[in-house]
């Protein structure tokens, strides 16, 4: 009893007197009464404030019509509630804040959403709040839309609904149904499928691609591979377009139906298309292609060179200032003027169930896009961006079907994002096994797995940054190479300029030529990206022209063929479609999602982002097995994604016009990576100081054979010749079909070098085939000349006797058989004689002493070879070392060839020892260099 009383009255204290307990007040009775009075007064104030706010809340009549207006959050809550919440969060103040914080708006909306006019006090009450539509605020609706779009998880939405954070799942389905049916009704009335957010009178482009959903549920039996079409409008300060009505449904007409109406049949039904069999030949090309093709060599000033000079200057600083921009994107953004464009208007059309990789779907997509574009901008030629496989289908439709699909009616573009990805993959193929990925790993720029992924351009943004770091590093390494050259020049010698030194070094050193070519190719790829970011159409066309020969040389036939067609189309654009060309020159061939500098992206890039927003991270579990749910997602998905974008656009803070890389932390990290990569290259050997005639993998010091060196020296010439021949034969003369196979070069590279050795069985088969052909010719000749067949095999008919040799190599004997023939004349002696000097066979010692834990050749000598030699000096006065000499015409040459061959590797003190030690010793040049290295080290030993 005492404990319960004390818990109820905390101001009381207990005093024990014998068996009795006395309860008394801690303080004076007056203070207690005053405190009780004050609490009653505060309770009255709170009650008055609550009544005022509740009165205003209950008068709120919200209605959601399918759009989030810019001031929808502020208009959905009463001013009294907003003021009270602001005072609670920030404290009472006389300062008026015109911009309410999002925190204040969020709490206020949740209060309104969870408010009830009266409390239901029933025994069967579950405690959940009953929400009415009149007090539905934008935030709970947005929360449900966001969760559904991201996870598509009903239970998660219901959990947050019970917490009072979002609307229920049933209400979400009701909204999606009303929106979808209202949108479809509008499409029926207008006779065309064209989203209401698009404006009239604006230049409009489109993108088409697959949209794939692979169900992750173990009970799923199917997947979705449909087609998505997005429309993009390009407003600017001069042309903003005319708004169309955006209310997508009437909130006063509530409906409980969850049934989705059907789309217009003219849109949803894809008619079949069949192409007549025939030769696929490119239409006649105007003279503008030739002039553009020839004039494109006169490139404009390259900002990439200025960036490299700027990076070299900034790397000499110990610490960067906040105004120093060393990364490529930040530097280019600092040199770009503020854009005059407005953020693009992007809308996704209802999706199709049909796969995009079909002639019928591509032809239907072209019709759908043309109808929508002409509805809002009647005089415009439709512009459609697609990936490479769809581009090939679209061009076939244009060239074979013609009429309403021909090149006068449509402009088909190859997606810029896919061109960039293909370019970096091609660059990765050229860099494979060169040591580039290992250099990035050793520098700490990336882990080995991530560095290897750069070769395949698995993550485009990371890959692009890695090449930027590499380009800045290679440029500085080349400058250091030139400084070393200047230090070696005598006073009486003429000093070469940097350009003269570079050209001379490229002619002499394959190593210099390879890495200088890598730098040029990286800058070419960055120039393509800069054309997108700056919306520079002429630079875009020139960058494509510079990259195309590499696709031919490195055997990328699909992009070599169809990117050439795209290049042809862009060159013909000024004469064939001058209005489209004028818009492209204004920057409308890319998408400006924000007002940030140097941030425009390609059409197919923004289409991929829109697709990702519709699909979310939850996949399409259960959709493909439910036709109604699938149709709801196909039609309502774009509209729900549009509403989420509207809400998030309203809550975004004041837009920053600076590029996202123009931050001091990003620049410091970039400079650190460049310095680390330079150190990594210098540890392995600066490729621009190598004056040798060999091409070496910098990480392993493996020496490439002559075929790889020839590839490095001729790759540019081969690509240019094949590209020029392709343009002449397919576009100008039209003597060949566009689908005729391209010549495959199979150029040996770092990853493919090495000669193939025929097995014994295959070698025997080759010899038998040669003998059979030879005998046939000799037999026929003998008969025609009345020869004596009895003497047919009297003479040798091969350059070497088959009984003594095979494929030009002497047949070897068995040493064990020779040992048996030697007489046993000497006696066995188990004790070593006492001598003053010994002669050691260095080659035998190397074969006998494996590297064990030694990592480099320096460590091998210090930890393995030298201790063995010093051990011999303990019992003798003098030790002599002799080494093998490998003569090209030695009798043992064939025996060594039978043992196989390993990888050629340069021997330097810091060179890592190969894992295959036996294979390394099978190469005569490796042993020559290793023996010389060990002999020179032995000469410097002190006893």
How would you describe each model-predicted region?
Residues 197-201, 374-380, 405-408, 831-833, ...:
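Short helix-terminating capping/connector loops at secondary-structure junctions
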Residues 200-208, 212-220, 224, 402, ...:
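Surface-exposed, charged/polar loop-rich segments
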Residues 174-176, 189, 220-225, 397-404, ...:
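Short secondary-structure boundary/capping segments
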Residues 3, 10, 16-399, 536:
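Long, structured protein-protein interaction/assembly regions in large complexes
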Residues 7, 56-58, 63-73, 82-96, ...:
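Noncatalytic, typically N-terminal accessory segments of nucleic acid-processing enzymes
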Residues 1, 5, 25, 49, ...:
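Alpha-helical interaction elements in eukaryotic regulators
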Residues 205-208, 381-387, 411-416, 838-840, ...:
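Extended hydrophobic secondary-structure segments that form protein cores and membrane-embedded regions
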Residues 214-215, 390-394, 420-423, 846-847, ...:
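Flexible loop/turn segments at secondary-structure boundaries
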């Amino acid at each position: 009893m005492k404990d319960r009383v004390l818990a109820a009255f905390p101001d009381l204290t207990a005093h024990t007197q014998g068996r009795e307990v006395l309860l008394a007040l801690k303080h004076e009775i007056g203070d207690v009464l005053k405190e009780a009075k004050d609490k009653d007064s505060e309770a009255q104030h709170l009650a008055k404030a609550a009544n005022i706010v509740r009165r205003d809340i209950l008068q709120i009549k919200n209605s959601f019509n399918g759009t989030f207006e810019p001031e929808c959050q502020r208009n959905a809550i009463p001013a009294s509630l907003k003021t009270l919440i602001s005072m609670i969060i920030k404290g009472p103040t006389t300062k008026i804040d015109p911009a309410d914080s999002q925190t204040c708006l969020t709490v206020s909306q949740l209060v309104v959403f969870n408010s009830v006019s009266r409390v239901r006090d029933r025994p069967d009450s579950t405690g959940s709040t009953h929400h009415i539509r009149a007090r539905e605020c934008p935030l709970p609706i947005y929360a449900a839309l966001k969760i559904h779009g991201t996870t598509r998880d009903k239970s998660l939405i219901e959990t947050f609904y019970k917490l009072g954070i979002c609307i229920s799942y049933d209400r979400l389905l009701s909204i999606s149904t009303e929106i979808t049916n209202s949108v479809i009704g509008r499409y029926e009335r207008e006779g065309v499928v064209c989203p209401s957010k698009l404006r009239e009178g604006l230049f409009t482009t489109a993108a088409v691609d697959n949209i794939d959903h692979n169900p992750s549920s173990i009970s799923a039996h199917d997947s979705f591979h449909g087609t998505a079409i997005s429309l993009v409008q390009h407003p600017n300060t001069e042309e903003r377009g005319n708004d169309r009505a955006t209310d997508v449904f009437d909130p006063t007409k509530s409906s409980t139906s969850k049934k989705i109406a059907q789309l217009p049949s003219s849109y949803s039904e894809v008619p079949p298309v069949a192409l007549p069999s025939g030769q696929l030949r490119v239409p006649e090309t105007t003279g503008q292609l030739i002039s553009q093709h020839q004039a494109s060599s006169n490139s404009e000033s390259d900002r990439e060179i200025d960036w490299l000079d700027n990076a070299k200057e900034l790397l000499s600083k110990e610490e960067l200032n906040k105004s120093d921009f060393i990364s490529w994107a930040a530097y280019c953004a600092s040199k770009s003027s503020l854009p005059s464009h407005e953020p693009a208007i992007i809308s996704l059309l209802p999706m199709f169930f049909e796969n995009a990789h079909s002639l019928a779907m591509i032809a239907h997509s072209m019709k759908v896009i043309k109808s929508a574009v002409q509805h809002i901008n009647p005089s415009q030629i439709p512009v459609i961006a697609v990936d490479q496989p769809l581009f090939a289908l679209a061009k076939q439709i244009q060239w074979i079907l013609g009429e309403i699909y021909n090149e006068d009616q449509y402009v088909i573009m190859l997606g810029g994002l896919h061109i960039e990805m293909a370019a970096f993959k091609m660059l990765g193929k050229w860099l494979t096994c060169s040591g580039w990925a290992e250099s990035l790993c050793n520098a700490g720029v990336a882990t080995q797995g991530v560095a290897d992924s750069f070769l395949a351009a698995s993550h485009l943004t990371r890959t692009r940054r890695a090449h930027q770091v590499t380009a800045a590093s290679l440029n500085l390494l080349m400058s250091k190479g030139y400084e070393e050259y200047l230090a070696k020049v005598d006073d009486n010698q003429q000093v070469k300029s940097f350009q003269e030194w570079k050209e001379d070094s490229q002619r002499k050193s394959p190593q210099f030529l390879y890495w200088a070519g890598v730098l040029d190719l990286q800058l070419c790829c960055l120039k393509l990206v800069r054309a997108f970011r700056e919306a520079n159409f002429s630079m875009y066309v020139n960058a494509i022209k510079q990259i195309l020969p590499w696709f031919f040389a490195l055997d990328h036939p699909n992009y070599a063929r169809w990117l050439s067609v795209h290049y042809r189309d862009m060159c013909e654009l000024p004469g064939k479609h001058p209005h489209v060309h004028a818009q492209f020159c204004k920057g409308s061939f890319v998408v400006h999602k924000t007002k940030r500098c140097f941030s425009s992206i390609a059409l197919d890039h923004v289409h991929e982002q829109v697709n990702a927003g519709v699909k979310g991270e939850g996949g399409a579990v259960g959709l493909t097995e439910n036709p109604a749910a699938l149709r709801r997602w196909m039609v309502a998905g774009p509209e729900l994604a549009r509403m989420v974008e509207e809400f998030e656009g309203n809550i975004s803070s004041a837009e920053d016009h600076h590029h996202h890389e123009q931050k001091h932390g990003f620049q410091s990290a970039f400079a650190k990576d460049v310095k680390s990569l330079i150190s990594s290259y210098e540890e392995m050997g600066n490729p621009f100081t190598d004056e040798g005639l060999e091409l070496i993998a910098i990480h392993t010091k493996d020496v490439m054979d002559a075929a790889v060196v020839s590839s490095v020296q001729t790759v540019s010439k081969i690509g240019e010749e094949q590209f020029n021949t392709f343009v002449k034969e397919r576009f100008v003369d039209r003597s060949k079909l566009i689908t005729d196979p391209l010549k495959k070069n199979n150029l040996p590279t770092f990853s493919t070098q090495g000669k193939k050795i025929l097995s014994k069985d295959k070698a025997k088969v080759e010899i038998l085939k040669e003998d059979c052909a030879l005998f046939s010719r000799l037999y026929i000749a003998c008969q025609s000349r009345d020869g004596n067949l009895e003497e047919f095999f009297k003479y040798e008919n091969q350059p070497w006797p088959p009984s003594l040799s095979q494929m030009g190599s002497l047949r070897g004997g068995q040493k064990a058989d020779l040992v048996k023939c030697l007489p046993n004349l000497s006696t066995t002696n188990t004790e070593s004689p006492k001598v003053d000097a010994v002669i050691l066979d260095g080659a035998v010692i190397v074969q006998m002493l494996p590297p064990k834990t030694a990592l480099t050749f320096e460590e091998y000598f210090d930890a393995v070879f030298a201790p063995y030699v010093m051990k011999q000096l303990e019992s003798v006065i003098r030790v002599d070392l002799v080494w093998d000499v490998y003569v090209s015409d030695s009798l043992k040459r064939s025996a060594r060839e039978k043992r196989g061959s390993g990888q050629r590797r340069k021997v330097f003190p810091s060179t890592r020892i190969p894992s295959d030690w036996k294979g390394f010793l099978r190469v005569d040049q490796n042993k020559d260099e290793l023996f010389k290295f060990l002999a020179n080290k032995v000469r410097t030993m002190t006893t």
